[in-house]
Amino acid sequence: MSLMKEMLSAGVHFGHKKAFWNPQMKEYIFGINHGVHIINLEKTVPLFQDAVNFVGKTVANGGKVLFVGTKRQAQDIIEAEAKRCGMPFVSHRWLGGMLTNYKTVRQSIKRLAQLEKMKEDGTFESLTKKEMLQNIRTIEKLEKVLGGIKEMGGLPDAIVVIDSNKEHIAIQEAQKLGIKVVSIVDTNSNPEGIDYIIPGNDDAVKSISFYMKKFADAVIDAQGLDRAVEAKAEETTEA
């Protein structure tokens, strides 16, 4: 099946009602059907391919890509696909400063690791019931917000975003730090300042699944390429 047909099947072409449109998306809109903007997939296909290739190259070069999608219908997909390809993710809430104040965030990640170790090695058993419950609640709270980035080990090289409106703070932080931004941009969104714009439906579960599966597949392929290059380098060194 061609990429265009896959996109049509996933409903990528369905935008928002005309009343909610952002005029800056005009060049990516094909027309209107029953008051809803239809996205021009002839524009989306090459832009999406460019974005997927960029993500693959970033990972092949040893980079990290952070998947971001905190809206309800994106949460499970973001988490599942990020875990499938071994990339960091944020699927519940974007903490202000998650990138721009990463040093502080890293301290919270360390705290989470310490508490998890205490829970595993039996240290919790020597605490009072109240202290134990407080620590368990802290673990749950930190895990929900930071669980997806606790293995990130530093700032990412790029972020992949579902819904540029909802994740505008994440995008602003990435832009400040010169981190490349790949984003699905619906007809009600502002494409300005996004490095890799993907005009498309950012609400339908089927569309979100389509995007994230393609990105995760690209990461997995790139990881295989990266490992092959490493193995070849090792062979050369040994020789």
From Swiss-Prot:
Q: Which Pfam families does UniProt cross-reference here?
A: Ribosomal_S2 (PF00318)
* Swiss-Prot/TrEMBL keywords: Ribonucleoprotein, Ribosomal protein
State the Gene Ontology BP annotations.
Answer: translation
GO CC annotations, alphabetized: cytosolic small ribosomal subunit
Known Gene3D superfamilies for this protein?
Answer: Glucose-6-phosphate isomerase like protein, domain 1, Helix hairpin bin
GO MF terms listed in the record are: structural constituent of ribosome
**Keyword Ribonucleoprotein found:** yes
Matches recorded under PANTHER family: 30S RIBOSOMAL PROTEIN S2 PROKARYOTIC AND ORGANELLAR (PTHR12534), SMALL RIBOSOMAL SUBUNIT PROTEIN US2M (PTHR12534:SF0)
Q: What HAMAP family does the record tag this protein with?
A: Ribosomal_uS2_B (MF_00291_B)
Q: Which family does it belong to?
A: Belongs to the universal ribosomal protein uS2 family.
The entry's protein name is Small ribosomal subunit protein uS2
Q: Which organism is it from?
A: Francisella philomiragia subsp. philomiragia (strain ATCC 25017 / CCUG 19701 / FSC 153 / O#319-036)
